[in-house]
């Protein structure tokens, strides 16, 4: 897509601008040894790759180690929401009912709802699942972003103008705003996607309202697809993904961003927009997009996708910075806390296999499985240091 002229520097000034770039890089350079000398963390991971403790929370707990005879050892990862093992929450939802709504209730209020409480909560969310035609036209359809995360930020920030009491940060008002965002963000995400596809790829534009009788996962799928159709398995898998991404210990980049921004006393919409900005980054939520791009690149450069040696050669080139985006990162591999396994990956992998079987895409699933197996081996033995790595 051609850059808008109002965002471009005159060609005649390019050389001078490049000189300024060099000066800027020199001016901002810090000797890397100083970080170790003054024990300054360069982000939310320590120099050894482990997560940095940034606060305390009882909402969720993430563990990747166990202590045996006073010695800390790698262990299979565990994720708890308000004391509940997330595997049990997702398992109940997959087999019996959709779990995202009751998980949201659990995270907000500290306990699982009974049937009556869940029905009331469903009713509140359903009553808020609406975006005015003016909002959709003026905010989402005009100047749609090539990256959906920017569209989400813009939309969330603009909701401030539609709120009669946006700056009140009392618990009751922030809860009201939070429920509004929980209800409206699925619509905002889907509508931004449709606008993106329409204006950048000339797809037909189909905007559908949410249906109050459906779960969040079902509504996303029926609004996303022109024919509104989806299979029960697709809805269950998406519901599981929503549950597993609902919370993660309070120390990840976007949640930490929210802590920092809200500490200034700013409004809910500004804080959430800042968190979305953080989530967009390729070393946080944006890594999902990088995984897709990396696999597309792998398809182009590996002739036999069932050959372990060719896959390993490609991944080694990625780690050297000679392939893909030259970052030296295998996206989707490694975690600041988890060691032997990531419980979210274990659960989603099981449902991904079921989905692949139903779609006739087991070869593609096997490729992802192969990259996971080979990639973890390469990363675990990188620099001749054996370190547990989870996908």
Language-model segments: which ranges?
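Non-transmembrane, aqueous-exposed alpha-helical and coiled segments at domain scale
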Residues: 2-391
């Amino acid at each position: 897509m051609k850059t808008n002229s109002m965002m471009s520097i005159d060609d005649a000034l390019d050389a001078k601008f490049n000189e300024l770039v060099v000066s800027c890089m020199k001016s901002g350079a810090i000797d890397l040894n100083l970080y170790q000398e003054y024990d300054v963390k360069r982000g939310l991971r320590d120099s050894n790759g482990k997560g940095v403790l940034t606060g305390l929370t009882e909402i969720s707990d993430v563990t990747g180690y166990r202590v045996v005879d006073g010695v800390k050892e790698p262990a299979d990862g565990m994720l708890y929401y308000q004391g509940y093992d997330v595997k049990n929450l997702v398992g109940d939802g997959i087999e019996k009912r959709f779990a995202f709504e009751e998980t949201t209730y659990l995270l907000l209020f500290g306990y699982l709802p009974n049937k009556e409480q869940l029905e009331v909560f469903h009713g509140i969310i359903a009553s808020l699942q609406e975006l005015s035609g003016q909002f959709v036209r003026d905010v989402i359809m005009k100047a749609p972003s090539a990256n959906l995360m920017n569209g989400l930020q813009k939309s969330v920030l603009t909701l401030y103008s539609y709120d009669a009491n946006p700056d009140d940060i009392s618990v009751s008002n922030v809860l009201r705003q939070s429920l509004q965002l929980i209800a409206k963000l699925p619509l905002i995400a889907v509508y931004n996607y449709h606008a993106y596809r329409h204006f950048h790829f000339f797809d037909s534009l189909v905007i559908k309202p949410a249906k109050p009788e459906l779960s969040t996962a079902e509504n996303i799928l029926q609004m996303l697809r022109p024919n509104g159709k989806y299979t029960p398995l697709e809805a269950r898998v998406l519901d599981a993904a929503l549950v597993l991404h609902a919370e993660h210990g309070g120390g990840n980049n976007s949640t930490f961003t929210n802590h920092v921004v809200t500490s200034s006393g700013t409004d809910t919409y500004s804080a959430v927009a800042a968190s979305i900005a953080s989530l967009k980054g390729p070393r946080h939520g944006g890594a999902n997009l990088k995984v897709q791009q990396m696999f597309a690149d792998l398809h182009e450069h590996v002739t036999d996708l069932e050959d372990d040696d060719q896959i390993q050669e490609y991944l080694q080139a990625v780690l050297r910075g000679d392939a893909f985006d030259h970052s030296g990162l295998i996206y989707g591999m490694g975690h600041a806390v988890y060691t032997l396994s990531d419980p979210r990956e274990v659960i989603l992998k099981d449902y991904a296999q079921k989905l692949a079987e139903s779609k006739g895409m087991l070869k593609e699933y096997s490729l992802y499985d192969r990259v996971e197996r080979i990639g973890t081996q390469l990363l675990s033995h990188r620099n001749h240091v054996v370190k547990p790595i989870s996908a």
